[in-house]
Each structure stands twice: as structure tokens, then as C-alpha cells.
Amino acid sequence: MSWITPDLIEILLSILKAVVILLVVVTCGAFMSFGERRLLGLFQNRYGPNRVGWGGSLQLVADMIKMFFKEDWIPKFSDRVIFTLAPMIAFTSLLLAFAIVPVSPTWVVADLNIGILFFLMMAGLAVYAVLFAGWSSNNKYSLLGAMRASAQTLSYEVFLGLSLMGVVAQAGSFNMTDIVNNQADIWNVIPQFFGFVTFAIAGVAVCHRHPFDQPEAEQELADGYHIEYSGMKFGLFFVGEYIGIVTISALMVTLFFGGWHGPFLPPFIWFALKTAFFMMMFILIRASLPRPRYDQVMSFGWKVCLPLTLINLLVTAAVILWQAQ
């Protein structure tokens, strides 16, 4: 079989790795919806979903059946094409953002030299999905939620990008694998602590998670920009939000907590344990913090996060120049 060449085998293995990693991410995002409800029940001293399967373990299957068989309704007054396109963009952009995350020294979907810029580009693309969903629904609550989401996301993406520049300056590269290798001796969270704090805050805001979930506030906007969605279209938004949490958690691990580095255990296990810890922190934040007003969220971003990121960047640049002399 002369057509089986080493190059073809390498391509097939790369495709297999990509499929496995992306399937694991989607599965983790789906299971996180169940885990969140169980943990919220624990934090609030009540029962979570515990009726379907052992300990409620089949609740996810019940949710999937419900989602698959719900009517996929498109309002007559909506723009059908854009209304259908919005959840696809939201799901795909958040899933592709994980492609540049190195899970282990040998497992990464796309080892790009501009990995961080690719992540920021995908995060910016998700804003279009929210705007499309809000505008095409032709609903005042959807439009208000989309306007809130776009303003909030675009604002906090500024801090998200600036908080990473200190890490880039220290590693001397935008490549995620190079950044992880640069943390073999000391994790970036120590010299870049303020960068990590602002990245974590901006990451929660970009995911529209509590306490930055004003675009989806049920009490104010009746669930915001996806109020008109049902069935699998709503499912794409729903699972996409949890995929965003998985991606941000994985990026925290990769950029600030040494990625796969750790003693005794295999690299993939260390990466999974660290990522699971930050995913649990997202749930703990939701369970413990109140929701501020929208103007307070925006004011906090521009008056606290922006100065903090700029100070961190200036100090990092000064230290690098001092060490170079």
C-alpha cells in the first residue's frame, strides 16, 4: 500500500487528536451543566438533580432528550437566516478558541505562533453571535441584552488582552507551548499576579457568567438575547457558554499555572486537575456573589481593571529592561 506515507499518517494522527480533544471539551461543557447544579445544591444546602440515574448522573441524558425533541421554533417576525446563524457562530467560535490550548507536550490541535492573538480573535467573533441573536429576534428584551453583552464583552476584552501582554513579554512569544515551557521553573502567577487577577475577572465577564451576567438577567431582561430561542438552537448557546468556561479555565492553567507541569502524575492529568479546579471556582463565584448593576460593572472595568492591567504591563516592561542591562 504505497499510498500510505509518513506524511499521511501524521495528518491522520493530527486529525484524530483534534477530534478527541474537541469531543472531550464538548463533553466537559455538557457535564459541567450537571455538575454546576449539583454543586449549587451543595453550596445552598439543598438537593440538586438527584432523580434520574444513580445520584442524578443521568440528568444530562434527560436534558439532551428534552433539547433534541423540543420544537425548534423560529418566530415569524425574526430574520430567519441571521437568527439561525447566530447560535452556530457562538458555539463554533468558543470551541475553536480551545484549539490553541496545549493539553500536554504532544497534544495540541493547532500549535500556532500567534496562539494568543487567535484566542482574542475568536473571543471577539463571539460578540457577533450575540449581536446577531439580539437583532434578528426582533424583540426589545433580546436587543437590550445584546447591546449590554456587546458593550460589556468589547470592554472587558481590552483588559483580557492587556492582562496577557505581561505573560507574552516574559515568554517572548505568542505561542502557547512556548509560554508553558517558560514556566518550567516558576509559574507566571507569581510574577504576573495582577495580570492573572485581571485576566480571571475579564474571563468571567467575557463568558457572561455571574456576577457579570447582566446581558442575561432574568429579572430585568427575561433571559436576554436568547429569549426567542428553543430546541437545539438554544442548546448551542447553552453548551457554548459552558465550553467558554472550560476554555477560560484551561487558558488560566496554561498561561499562569504552568500548564501540564507538575510532579509525579502524567502531564495530561495535571492539566485536567488544574482546569477542573478553576471550573469549580466559576461555580463557587456564582453561588456566593451578588449581581451588581450594569453601570457598576462597566465602571469597575474601566476604573479598576484597566489601570491595574496598565500598571502590571509597565512594571513588567521595566523589570525586563532592567534585567537586560
Swiss-Prot record:
<dbReference type="Pfam" id="PF00146">
    <property type="entry name" value="NADHdh"/>
</dbReference>
<dbReference type="GO" id="GO:0016655">
    <property type="term" value="F:oxidoreductase activity, acting on NAD(P)H, quinone or similar compound as acceptor"/>
</dbReference>
<comment type="function">
    <text>NDH-1 shuttles electrons from NADH, via FMN and iron-sulfur (Fe-S) centers, to quinones in the respiratory chain. The immediate electron acceptor for the enzyme in this species is believed to be ubiquinone. Couples the redox reaction to proton translocation (for every two electrons transferred, four hydrogen ions are translocated across the cytoplasmic membrane), and thus conserves the redox energy in a proton gradient. This subunit may bind ubiquinone.</text>
</comment>
<feature type="transmembrane region" description="Helical">
    <location>
        <begin position="50"/>
        <end position="69"/>
    </location>
</feature>
<comment type="subunit">
    <text>NDH-1 is composed of 13 different subunits. Subunits NuoA, H, J, K, L, M, N constitute the membrane sector of the complex.</text>
</comment>
<keyword id="KW-1133">Transmembrane helix</keyword>
<keyword id="KW-0997">Cell inner membrane</keyword>
<dbReference type="GO" id="GO:0005886">
    <property type="term" value="C:plasma membrane"/>
</dbReference>
<feature type="transmembrane region" description="Helical">
    <location>
        <begin position="304"/>
        <end position="324"/>
    </location>
</feature>
<feature type="transmembrane region" description="Helical">
    <location>
        <begin position="154"/>
        <end position="174"/>
    </location>
</feature>
<feature type="transmembrane region" description="Helical">
    <location>
        <begin position="81"/>
        <end position="101"/>
    </location>
</feature>
<keyword id="KW-0874">Quinone</keyword>
<dbReference type="GO" id="GO:0009060">
    <property type="term" value="P:aerobic respiration"/>
</dbReference>
<keyword id="KW-1278">Translocase</keyword>
<dbReference type="GO" id="GO:0048038">
    <property type="term" value="F:quinone binding"/>
</dbReference>
<protein>
    <recommendedName>
        <fullName>NADH-quinone oxidoreductase subunit H</fullName>
        <ecNumber>7.1.1.-</ecNumber>
    </recommendedName>
</protein>
<feature type="transmembrane region" description="Helical">
    <location>
        <begin position="237"/>
        <end position="257"/>
    </location>
</feature>
<feature type="transmembrane region" description="Helical">
    <location>
        <begin position="265"/>
        <end position="285"/>
    </location>
</feature>
<keyword id="KW-0472">Membrane</keyword>
<feature type="transmembrane region" description="Helical">
    <location>
        <begin position="11"/>
        <end position="31"/>
    </location>
</feature>
<keyword id="KW-1003">Cell membrane</keyword>
<comment type="similarity">
    <text>Belongs to the complex I subunit 1 family.</text>
</comment>
<dbReference type="InterPro" id="IPR001694">
    <property type="entry name" value="NADH_UbQ_OxRdtase_su1/FPO"/>
</dbReference>
<dbReference type="GO" id="GO:0003954">
    <property type="term" value="F:NADH dehydrogenase activity"/>
</dbReference>
<feature type="transmembrane region" description="Helical">
    <location>
        <begin position="186"/>
        <end position="206"/>
    </location>
</feature>
<keyword id="KW-0812">Transmembrane</keyword>
<feature type="transmembrane region" description="Helical">
    <location>
        <begin position="114"/>
        <end position="134"/>
    </location>
</feature>
<keyword id="KW-0830">Ubiquinone</keyword>
<dbReference type="InterPro" id="IPR018086">
    <property type="entry name" value="NADH_UbQ_OxRdtase_su1_CS"/>
</dbReference>
<keyword id="KW-0520">NAD</keyword>
